[in-house]
Amino acid sequence: MKRIIIASFILFLALTSANARGVKVRSVKGLRRAIERAVPGDTIVLGKGTYRLKESLRIEGKTDLAIIGDGAIISGGVRIGRWRLRKASGMAEGARRLNLKRYPLSGVVTKGDPHLTGPSWSEFFADGRSMRLSEWPDGGPLPLDSVVVRGQGRIRNQPGDGFGTIAFSSDRPLEWKDPTLGWLSGCFRFGWTNEMVPIAEMGPGKTFTAGDLTNYGFGFQPGDRFQRWRVLNIPEEVTLPGEYSLDASSKTAVLMLPEGCKRLEMSVMEDPLIVLDGCEKVTLQGFELCYSRGDGIVITAGRDVQVKDCDIHGLGHVAAKIDSANLRCGLSGCHLYDLGAGGVELAGGDRRNVVRGDNYVEGCRIHNYNRIENQYRVGVVMSGLGNRITACEFYDSASMAILMLGNDQTVEYCNVHHVCMDIEDNGALYYGRSFAHRGGVIRWNYFHDIEVPFNVRAVYHDDGSGAAEVYGNVFQRISSPPVQIGGGSYIRYHDNTFIDLPCAAIKVDGRLKTWGADRVPIMRDSIRHVDSPAFWEHYPELEPYLNGDPAEPQHNTLINNVFCNVAAAFEKVVWSDHFYNNDIEGRANFFDEMHGNSKVEKLDGGLALPERVPPTSQHELHFIHDAFNGAQYGILDERHTAANGNSQ
């Protein structure tokens, strides 16, 4: 017998009463009580309102349960009355000071270590939009052209002295009352590593000394276009609407609210908002999750757990984590945006024993997910074996859309654009540096409008990684070669279409034989994590490949691809064993010839992409609008529909 628990009437009446403020403790207790009492077959429906948490909402060991938000908001923050803001003397016109002694407060912390990440500091949100730390200079980062002390590097243990010192020429920092409130932020050596380290002191000779190690030290490559820096969190630099500065020691903040701001929130909670542990056939639907320093949803040891139609935003870390112990768990139809350090961490499956996870992210819109960290903090990072990303849209990101690690992963029907907008040597879809990462399938995606002055790809097989099949994709308007095979083997590209490129479409190199030879031991070592009879049997080509010369690219296939209006089809094809039937054309009927049963229509003098790319009995990829004119598109198959819409 199924029961429906209407939480707003039974347990949460305070949220619908005339004087309710959405902060009643008994409301959250009631929600927890409803979950505890639920039996298989129940549905819990929450009334509209804001449920403010001080600790994680835990759903443990439940079976066959639906929890429906119906617009309910789960918040890890506090609302701050504007009457608490006072004029900030000595600061810019419009700046206000806020005393935060009554609130739990976390100060700004070091960010940028690719191996360590965690909750953000306490952030402010004005009318639902994140505010940003004050920045100097306002006109953008400064070139790193004067390094006094290089400092040691955290990752490669670069030789150097201490934490590093850089010089500046402006007199403006001399006006700051306390420079040690500031944080140095920027790319201090390589363009793929953006960091934040505290200022330990400002020296008399116009210098800043860092208070922590950076990843690679300062200024090893003077003149590199990515070596740039700025200072964040100085109170005197709160000069533009939407900026703030935070002083955890005095528990105060200086803010300049956007014009017309009606609601101010501050993130407080550090733990995940919702944890689903050991659940089976549980659905969480229709919630808005926001204003937390940590993660939104964490799913552990679940079976058939689904997060559906949720808006997750304003978090200091990631929207959702699905760990390796889950099976058939995922997100569907969710909108993930304004996130601190990535969208979804999608794990699952057993690589050593070759057991699929079948976890997924499908039909989701994921954007603006690098507010705080961007180095390998991506829209979705995949790990494990046998998981998929289907029918998702990724855009407006400083970093990658997808980091594909592990085995037998699938990325399909996705719309990927305007990503990698502020990073170097990356790819919209990226994987690298492991001979064990194999079996990836990248099919029927649309990569487009990645036009930046940096060295980024649409699909990047980095540092010898390979064993992937890439087909049916469309690549359009990308400023660097959309595809790079960086020394890998067993990569098969077929039936892809490349359009409107000012560069070569595909680049293949043999870096493991030359400048990247030092990667080979690292790549070989990656096998030990999955060394088992089951793994070797599943990938029979791997053993002879490793017993030969794995540094030599081999068994790469580039066939049946189409190129139209590109500078060149291939930058280098020396390391391709099979290379034929690649059609390089600029004529209007090239789609007809490439895809025999595809219907091509003229739209406003341009070309519509074919209805099927390539034709298949199981799936259909429908491009609804004229991709030549840069329009949006939709994608359909028998199970999935992509959700399109404007950025929020």
Regions found by a protein language model. Name each.
Residues M1-I4:
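Positively charged n-region of N-terminal signal peptides that target proteins for export
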Residues I6-A18:
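Hydrophobic h-region of N-terminal signal peptides that target proteins for export
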Residues K24-R26, R32-R33, R37-T300, Q306, ...:
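Extracellular polysaccharide-degrading/modifying enzymes targeting complex plant/algal/animal polysaccharides
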Residues R37-P40, H313, Y337:
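Charged, alpha-helical scaffolding/interaction elements associated with membrane systems
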Residues R52-K54, G61, L331, T410, ...:
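Acidic, glycine-rich calcium-binding repeat modules characteristic of RTX/beta-roll
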Residues D295-V298, G316-L327, Y337-R612, A642-N644:
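Glycine- and acidic/polar-rich repeat regions and solenoidal domains
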Residues V305-D311, A468:
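Surface-exposed extracellular loop regions of Gram-negative outer-membrane beta-barrel proteins
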